[in-house]
Amino acid sequence: MDQEQLFDKLYSLNLQLTAKNDQKKRKPVFYPEWEKDPTDTNDDVYYGLRYKPEAKKTLRSTWMQSEFESHRSSSA
């Protein structure tokens, strides 16, 4: 195997690993069953539930903030 073939092999392996790592970083998206597009072939879309991580995060942060404020006011 000459140097150019070796470089091509390493480059293709690097691309494969990068693609695999990018797939791991993507979060799944959930949509209700009635919004399902029969022509959609995206494997990252799951139907039946709606998943909104930003809504969950906002809800938790507001809950934590209100908990903290109530604790602070009761201890003062």
Swiss-Prot record:
Species of origin? African swine fever virus (strain Badajoz 1971 Vero-adapted) (Ba71V)
Q: What is this protein called?
A: Uncharacterized protein C76L
Would you say which domain of life the source belongs to?
Viruses
